Amino acid sequence: MESLPTTVSGKSDRRGRFSKSQNTSKPSLILAFFSCLAWLYVAGRLWQDAQYRAALNTVLKMNYDQRPKVLTVEDKLVVLGCKDLERRIVETEMELAQAKSQGYLKKQKSVSSSGKKMLAVIGVYTGFGSHLKRNKFRGSWMPRDDALKKLEERGVVIRFVIGRSANRGDSLDRKIDEENRATKDFLILENHEEAQEELPKKVKFFYSAAVQNWDAEFYVKVDDNVDLDLEGMIALLESRRSQDGAYIGCMKSGDVITEEGSQWYEPEWWKFGDDKSYFRHATGSLVILSKNLAQYVNINSGLLKTYAFDDTTIGSWMIGVQATYIDDNRLCCSSTRQEKVCSMA
């Protein structure tokens, strides 16, 4: 019986140790549980990051495939169309060389009834409001009707040169058409708008139209305020027949006017250098170009630069070609000398 307390006491010790171990294992279980949660969270994030990386790689690969390639100079030229343009330029140069060898002629031009090449085409500038001036010329130095035809048989063509109205087909155009049907002495520039500010461009259209319609030795531009000594002009041109590259007129140069609003103001004055002086050129009242120079204007009309005035415009074209400048005092229409072939009307 004495041993019983010992047994009871041992059982109590075991229960105490069990409850203590039970109390100790609860935090461990909780820690283990949270460790599992943390592991699952980390594993989930790692998996999610892996998915993001895979998606990012896919996007990068797509962008890489779609990004512009590094182009060589040749590739860039092809993309810009320069290669095709270069080919067309070469073809055009070959066509131009062939045209030069044939005298620039695009088609057979009119010749006199005798079969000889025309001596000259004389274009007299006119405007819509110049009907009285035209009649004055027809009654003085300019032949009309049968006399005009006989002059053409001698190799000289004279035409009034005019463009079209800004309002195509209006009363201004109709009056010119009616007058031309009666007199047959107009060269109508269909692609040119007749206006004061368009005069420098008119020169291109005149020489182009004249070259395309008549095969002549010379092409003469005359203002409508000039009276011609026609026989004197013919004699002057005959003396220069077959002279290539002839740029003939009353040569001059002068100051470039820079003051806006002045009568002779040149908007592009800064292109004429610090001295602001025009190059030598023929006065606009009367300008003569030989056949090859007029044909040069015809071929390059789309590229030729125009300035504020037609005389300096023509002079600028002549600087870039092999032109022979012929300063003939007989063509100084405003001078007082006796031996001249023109005078101010």
Swiss-Prot record:
GO BP annotations listed: arabinogalactan protein metabolic process; protein O-linked glycosylation via hydroxyproline
Lumenal side: 45-345
Cytoplasmic topology ranges: 1-27
Gene Ontology CC, one term: Golgi membrane
Pathway membership: Protein modification; protein glycosylation
TM region(s), chain numbering: 28-44
Segments for region (Disordered): 1-22
Name under which the protein is recorded: Hydroxyproline O-galactosyltransferase HPGT2
UniProt source species: Arabidopsis thaliana
